[in-house]
């Protein structure tokens, strides 16, 4: 079941993001968020699927949210459009793994998440986002909203892989680039919050490789004492 929170005048959403970001702006230092990474695979019928991750240096680091606000918008785009399965949804909250045997192509649905690849034990929330264009195969474009979980939710933790899943995106054709710019908030294992704005990614796949086109942005955190 998809859970969407509609917040009055968007004030609650702004406070949620601002509180996390302001707490991380006192000084900057070497961050334990190290950037974005990906996995990809062929999905059949001239489709290819990319999984996007936020990478960390400590297993206890956490990614708690992906957001957009007045300072930094968010977009995730594909040149040939995104594959959307009718039995899926815009987030991993809609992915029921019990249906994979009956509808194998559901495994390649396009969705966003915080750490969880399906609805099992998934505590993610969504605020202020209209998914209609994305669900029709179009882009994700957000100027004020977020998908997120709390620091109490295990799905936010980097774990032994030192990464947290952000989304799965399937597109049409090997010539179709998936690219975007996202903003992240989270918390390090020492309980210090961080914010990473304008994290750009863009990859063009090939039969045996993907070309990394770019990765840029800024992130801030409190200095360790």
State each model region's role.
Residues 16-25, 211-216:
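Sec-dependent N-terminal signal peptides
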Residues 10-16, 221-225:
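Positively charged n-region of N-terminal signal peptides that target proteins for export
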Residues 12, 27-32:
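Sec/Tat signal peptide C-region and signal peptidase I cleavage site
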Residues 205-221:
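A short, hydrophobic C-terminal helix/tail in secreted or cell-surface proteins
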Residues 9-10, 24, 206:
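Low-complexity intrinsically disordered segments
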Residues 1-12:
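Short, Lys/Arg-enriched N-terminal segments with co-localized hydrophobic residues
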Residues 32-203:
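Non-catalytic macromolecular-recognition regions in eukaryotic signaling proteins
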